[in-house]
Amino acid sequence: MDNEYKNIDNKLKKEIGKFLTYNYSKNNNVVAIKYLGYVRLLNMNNSIRDLCMESSSKNMNDYNTFNNYVYNKIEELIYFMLDKYKKTEIESAGLRIIQIDKLCEELSLDAKKIVLDNLGIFDENFNYKKENSTAKLKFYLLFLLINHNKSCDKIALFNKMNNILKNFNPQYNVHSDPNVISFCDPNVISFCDTLVYNKLIDNKNLVALIKML
């Protein structure tokens, strides 16, 4: 894993530095989720991990141990950072831990419209390989909304999303299992994995996030 991420070390450190001095009065939801993405990336690289977690991470050298540590202590880790970096401002982002299934059930009446409205950004001009992480994150959030929603026409929407990916990424593997989707960008994988794996967001912020990205 370290080898896979060694080329983004310096870039990520700079991004983390920007995050720690960011103006949280703008785009609070996005910043909070971006932070969670950094937390998820910590287990990939010792220097990045130490930079962010300092003393809390220094004895966590084993990948699986640290991964479990992050998962089991995610709320504590968030508040560790909040205590040190603009606690009040990040708290105002309103992030809370809930079950992703419950979230999407709450959105059941609006989910299909949200998905269809937002798929429009992935038109014939969308270049999968060149699009930035924000676009891919939005795509993945739409995917999750479909997958966990009982009122959506899953087959039609998944086919549309799969076709978008096939058109712009010939190596993309169309999965028969809708619970699995692949992205070539490890940063996007980490951001999305954090959001889902740690079940971190509420329904109001998810709708706002999808619409603003």
UniProtKB/Swiss-Prot annotation:
<protein>
    <recommendedName>
        <fullName>Uncharacterized protein R902</fullName>
    </recommendedName>
</protein>
